[in-house]
Amino acid sequence: YNDDDVFRYERPDELTDPRSGVICIPNNYRYPNGEQMPEGQLRVTCLANYEKWGALDENTYRSQKEICRKAMLDVALGYLPNGKSMAKELEERTELLDIFSPRTIKKFTSHLDGALYGSPRKSRDGSTQFSNLYLAGSDQGYVGIVGAMLGGVAVANNRILRGD
């Protein structure tokens, strides 16, 4: 989603920029025989500033995560059918919150500047140090889910169609 006149894919000046992001409902599928997942999931991701998050003391960090969560959810719910009108019910029925920042990602994955996707070293052609092993996805430097798909297409085109 993008809630601004222009999409700015850049590091925000603030901790986060909730004006644009990705909404993911990962278990929103039709299952066989009418089965359903016992709970729903909603993920919202937006651009964030690693340096700003990294500079916060622990108490401020925790309070800012909650402030940013509320701001992100407020914008994202506006893009879902009846989202704004269901905000209170969603809050009441929430069983688990997992809020993370670039600081969290850096701590657990060592990704450069807490980046969410891909390897810190991009390989445009997908090559690795092993013959016949190629990375295809966000490791080509494209962004997000569509970027991962484009990365796969680019590597497949280079390796299979062109025979590089």
Each predicted region: which residue ranges?
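Short glycine/proline-enriched loop/turn "hinge" motifs that connect secondary-structure elements
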Residues: 31-39, 124-129
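A glycine-rich dinucleotide-binding beta-alpha-beta segment and adjacent secondary-structure elements
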Residues: 80-142
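Short, glycine-/Ser/Thr-/acidic-enriched flexible segments
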Residues: 4, 27-30, 47-51, 140-141
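Active-site lining segments that contact anionic ligands and/or coordinate catalytic metals
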Residues: 18-20, 39-41, 130-131
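Glycine-rich, aromatic-lined ligand/substrate-binding cores of catalytic
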Residues: 34-70
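A conserved FAD-binding loop/helix module that cradles the flavin
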Residues: 130, 136-163
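Flavin-binding catalytic cores
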Residues: 16, 36, 60-100
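Mid-domain catalytic core of redox enzymes
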Residues: 1-35
